[in-house]
């Protein structure tokens, strides 16, 4: 992910340089009518500036709703950002985000629709390529197509020193004890609230799988205490009740 982001930043710097070169060329073209040239460039810059400000405000609102675990409102914001992008290839990051949010709400049909609209080409930004294949692999994994998920991950995603959630699931599918070790290792490193909850939920499921119901209950409770329409949070609430009833019977 870090390498993909670094490459994307480099591409953005290249685009900025191209923009500056074009601006300079426009000034040369309008050299004899300098005031007209400056006026045209000023108008272009003002339009771009206000476009970026509006885009940034909507983007921040979208991220705020993700932090608040209100994905329905975040989806509304993402759709606005999606409509603002006029170039099809620039819409892909919003298609990926929409797909991920719909999947977390257990709306598989919508999730797959947006993911299928993404077109990967040699012009695709590295961070978009990374996010697409990660989301595609996750979709395959959680729909029971684990071999396909493994193949997508191995062929398209470079392994990093810090394993992500999907990589841990794929590597330790048949070794829940080691899966717990790896999940516990990455949990303190999580900065994003939603991803941290996903790791806690994975720990709850894995602890339940190995029969450590006390630890499973501990993590299920941490997830279940959040108020959200996210599907795994709803399931965690049900699991807390289920394990509580089991404990009473014992």
Give residue ranges: language-model regions.
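Alpha-helical adaptor scaffolds
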Residues: 100-106, 129-138, 142-143, 151-192, ...
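"A position-specific structural signal for the A-helix of alpha-solenoid helical repeats
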Residues: 60, 90-97, 128-135, 162-170, ...
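Alpha-helical segment of the N-proximal tetratricopeptide repeat
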Residues: 56-87, 93-105, 120
